[in-house]
C-alpha cells in the first residue's frame, strides 16, 4: 500500500516524524509537507506565486519533500506531479492508496476543523478520490507524541479498512492529551457546532503602529454526549466521519416546496 503523509505543522514537526514511523507498518510512505508551519490556513491554495518542491534528506536517506505552500498545495503536488515523477507519466491520485495528515499539535474539533490545514489536507485527498484520515493531538506546549503515536497506530489499524467504503468522506481523529491510563476509550463522534467568540487585542508595534492579536474562546453551547468536543474533554479518542458535501438536505427539501417557477418570467415581462 502506498501512503501519502502530510501535515500543516511543517516538514520538521515532531508529529510528522512519529506519523511516518507509524505508517511504515502499513505500507510504503511518501512524505510531502509544507516547508514551514501552516497552521490555520484552512483549504487555501497558492495561485499568485510559483510552488517549489525540494527533497529533504535525513540520515543519508530521502525523508520526503518540502513545499513552499499550504497543506492543500502539498497534496495537489504529490497527487498530480510527484506521482508522475515516481510512478510514471500516466500516474495520478490513484497511485496512492491512502493519505494521512498529522500528527497535528493541537486538536481540530468542531468548527475549528474548517480552519485546520491538517483537516484540509485530508479533505483535498478525498476530493481527488484518495481515502484520507486526519489525526490531531490535544495540547500545544507539551505534547507526548510518543504516547499519542501508539494510540494513533492502534486506532488507525482498526479504521483503515473503512476508509474507502463511503464516497466523499474522510475521518477526523482527535486524541486527548492525558496519561494513557486515563484515556477512557475510543468513540465515534459527530462534529460539534460551537462557534468562537472573536476578540482582538490592540497593541503597538516597535514603530508605534497599531497591531491586533486575535484571541477569544469557544462559545459555550449545549454539548451532546456524542460530539467531538465533549468526548475529548471526557478523555475519549474521538473519530468523526466528515464529508465535503455541504448541502443542507433538510433545508433543500423545504425550499423545493416553494413555487419559484414564475419568478424569472415576471422579471422578463
Where are the predicted features?
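Glycine/threonine-rich flexible loop motifs
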Residues: 107-116
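A cross-family phosphate/adenosyl-ligand binding-site feature
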Residues: 2-3, 14-94
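C-terminal accessory domains and tails appended to enzymatic cores
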Residues: 162-166, 176-269
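Hydrophobic/aromatic ligand-binding patch that stacks against planar heteroaromatic rings
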Residues: 121-125
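Short, glycine-/small-residue-rich phosphate/pyrophosphate-handling segment
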Residues: 133-162
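Conserved acidic residues
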Residues: 97-98
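Short, glycine-rich nucleotide/cofactor-binding loops
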Residues: 5-12, 112
Amino acid at each position: 500500500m502506498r501512503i501519502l503523509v502530510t501535515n500543516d505543522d511543517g516538514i520538521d514537526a515532531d508529529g510528522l516524524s512519529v506519523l511516518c514511523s507509524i505508517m511504515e507498518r502499513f505500507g510504503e510512505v511518501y512524505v510531502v509537507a509544507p516547508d514551514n508551519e501552516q497552521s490555520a490556513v484552512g483549504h487555501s491554495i497558492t495561485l499568485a506565486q510559483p510552488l517549489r518542491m525540494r527533497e529533504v534528506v535525513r540520515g543519508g536517506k530521502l525523508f520526503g519533500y518540502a513545499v513552499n505552500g499550504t497543506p492543500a498545495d502539498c497534496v495537489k503536488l504529490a497527487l498530480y506531479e510527484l506521482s508522475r515523477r515516481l510512478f510514471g507519466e500516466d500516474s495520478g491520485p490513484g497511485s496512492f492508496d491512502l493519505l494521512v495528515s498529522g500528527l497535528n499539535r493541537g486538536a481540530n474539533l468542531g468548527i475549528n476543523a474548517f480552519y485546520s490545514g491538517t483537516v484540509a489536507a485530508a479533505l483535498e485527498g478525498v476530493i481527488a478520490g484518495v481515502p484520507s484520515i486526519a489525526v490531531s493531538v490535544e495540547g500545544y506546549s507539551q505534547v507526548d507524541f510518543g504516547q499519542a503515536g501508539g494510540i494513533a497506530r492502534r486506532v488507525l489499524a482498526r479504521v483503515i479498512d473503512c476508509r474507502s467504503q463511503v464516497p466523499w468522506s474522510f475521518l477526523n481523529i482527535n486524541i486527548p492529551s492525558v496519561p494513557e491510563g486515563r484515556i477512557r476509550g475510543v468513540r465515534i463522534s459527530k462534529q460539534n457546532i460551537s462557534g468562537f467568540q472573536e476578540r482582538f487585542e490592540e497593541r503597538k508595534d516597535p514603530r508605534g503602529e497599531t497591531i491586533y492579536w486575535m484571541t477569544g474562546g469557544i462559545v459555550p453551547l449545549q454539548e451532546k454526549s456524542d460530539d467531538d468536543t465533549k468526548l475529548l474533554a471526557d478523555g475519549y479518542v474521538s473519530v468523526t466521519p466528515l464529508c465535503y458535501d455541504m448541502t443542507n438536505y433538510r433545508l433543500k427539501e423545504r425550499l423545493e416546496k416553494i413555487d419559484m417557477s414564475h419568478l424569472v418570467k415576471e422579471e422578463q415581462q
